[in-house]
Amino acid sequence: MNFRLHIILVTVAILSQACANLENRFPGVPEDLFEWEDTVSLGLPGLPGCNQVVVHESPGYANNVLVTAFGGQYYCMWQSSERDEDTPDTRVVYAVSSDGKHWNGPIDLALPTDSTFVTPGGWIQRGETLTAVLNYICASDRSKGGAAWYISTSDGEKWTDPQPLRMADGRPMQGILEQDPLRLPGGRTVGAAHFRPGLRVNPVYTDDPAALTGWTEATFPAGEGSPLEPSQYLAPDEKLVMLFRDQASSFVKLVSVSEDQGVSWTPTTKTNIPDSRSKQCAGTLPDGRAFWVGNPTGSKSRRALVLALSRDGFLFDKAYLLAGPKNLPPRRNEGRYKTLGYNYPKAVVIGDTLWISLSVNKEDAVLYRVPVNSL
């Protein structure tokens, strides 16, 4: 299939979803938000004030970059390996900064075992404790899944021994926790995990203040597409909205909505929001506006990094190009699944800044810092 025909088919799919999404109150974008013939910027403006910080240039593989702030310092972790993605030598490393611009590291945070490699599962900050969630995944066969563990620190230097996250019945979580669990105003924490067999994704929640125990699988009926790697946000009407990558190659985001604080969710439905079949992120700004960050190319290309905004949490009618092909450096070294582009963004609001962490070409750990007052 040539590129032009592919874009036409994706555009038809996007437009066909627009009316249905509007009627059913699912997230969507105006049909003219992106200019498909513009393969450089998608017709989007840049964002003044957005600046890039390179945390680490890796000689091998780096991905799943996550940033947080704790105790007056910034912490950034990612998975690292010598050459390829998800190999037995994959470990989690982190770097530390006092100003968010200059970083020390990387420092080993978690090492692989004889039978598992380890990837980041997210930061959880509660009071004077910072917790790093670590996903230990079967090295010989990823379809056998993994398990979520954690380590904690009170000073940013000394870490506890690994302990398993636990389900409500006390069992260890035999699942891979997605990297940006959301704490709701009432104290509940909502996220998603990929459970055995294979990568079966399911929303999860806990009322444990520390978010270390009490995890429960939410009710999540089967729906459209092949959902993976979601992120969630709280809409102004207090509905929880979870956006998913569609591994079935629809090249649009999937969505599920919860009206009971994450206990039950609607079946996944295709949106008209274009995607690159990649991990993305979503969240809520301090003024209540919802946002998502991803690669809305309608193809496998991840060479455009876009931030989209919505006042009501459903119509994303404003978008900015944070980085595009012109900003993309060449890949330095070959490696399995080292996709060119802006990979796996995750975002968090720290103070008056939206921090977007990602991997460039799955080689470099990079941050984009966006002043909230510029949005």
Feature map (PLM): residue ranges:
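Bacterial N-terminal signal peptides that target proteins for export
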Residues: 1-7
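Bacterial N-terminal signal peptides
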Residues: 8-16
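Beta-rich carbohydrate-recognition and catalytic domains
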Residues: 19-60, 68-116, 124-178, 182-277, ...
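Charged, often glycine-rich, active-site loop that binds/positions anionic groups
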Residues: 121
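Short glycine-rich, acidic/polar surface loops and turns
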Residues: 279, 343-345
